[in-house]
Amino acid sequence: MSLNLEEKKAVVAEVAAQVAAAQTVVVAEYRGIAVEDMTQLRVKARKEGVYLRVLKNTLVRRAVADTPFAGIADQLVGPLAYGISKDPVAAAKVMHEFSKTNDKFVVKAGAMPNFLMSPKDVGNLASMPSREELLSKLLGTMQAPIAQFVRTLNEVPTKFVRGLAAVRDKQAA
């Protein structure tokens, strides 16, 4: 089904809006994938907050022109699925994990603002923890000394109470 000029402009505007807010764009070739597999990928992408679409390459070229992702335009050849994400890791993680389980889905390239990534770089990015995981690790690291200090302070009255209980038990016996 061919799109008319107004529909194409709407698609370009929609993709341009997604790219403007994005931290990562990942491109993958999808030749010969079953519909149910692609549906599973879309469900997982939606759950992770990744904008996943199959688009005409010329429309995407227009959408990324004059953006920090313009370098990816040279990689847009063949039937491609586009993953666009505000989270720097989410699109890479979703698409890389899917490519592990489906050999007909091949990650071709990725981009971060003003940086083009190879498929290997996308795999490395996918292996990184998400922003939430990194923040929770940082918080745990910052909180550990304080928690240990509080436990140490709590130990003094606890030992005192145990000593009183031992004296009471000895006198009661």
UniProtKB/Swiss-Prot annotation:
GO terms for biological process: translation. GO terms for molecular function: large ribosomal subunit rRNA binding. One of its GO terms (cellular component) is ribonucleoprotein complex. Pfam families: Ribosomal_L10. Transmembrane segments: none annotated. Keywords: Ribonucleoprotein, Ribosomal protein, RNA-binding, rRNA-binding. It comes from the Bacteria. The keyword Ribonucleoprotein applies. InterPro entries: Ribosomal_uL10 (IPR001790), Ribosomal_uL10-like_sf (IPR043141), Ribosomal_uL10_bac (IPR022973), Ribosomal_uL10_bac_type (IPR047865). HAMAP family: Ribosomal_uL10. Part of the ribosomal stalk of the 50S ribosomal subunit. The N-terminus interacts with L11 and the large rRNA to form the base of the stalk. The C-terminus forms an elongated spine to which L12 dimers bind in a sequential fashion forming a multimeric L10(L12)X complex. Belongs to the universal ribosomal protein uL10 family. Forms part of the ribosomal stalk, playing a central role in the interaction of the ribosome with GTP-bound translation factors. This is Large ribosomal subunit protein uL10. It comes from Thiobacillus denitrificans (strain ATCC 25259 / T1). The lineage of its organism: Bacteria, Pseudomonadati, Pseudomonadota, Betaproteobacteria, Nitrosomonadales. The gene is rplJ.
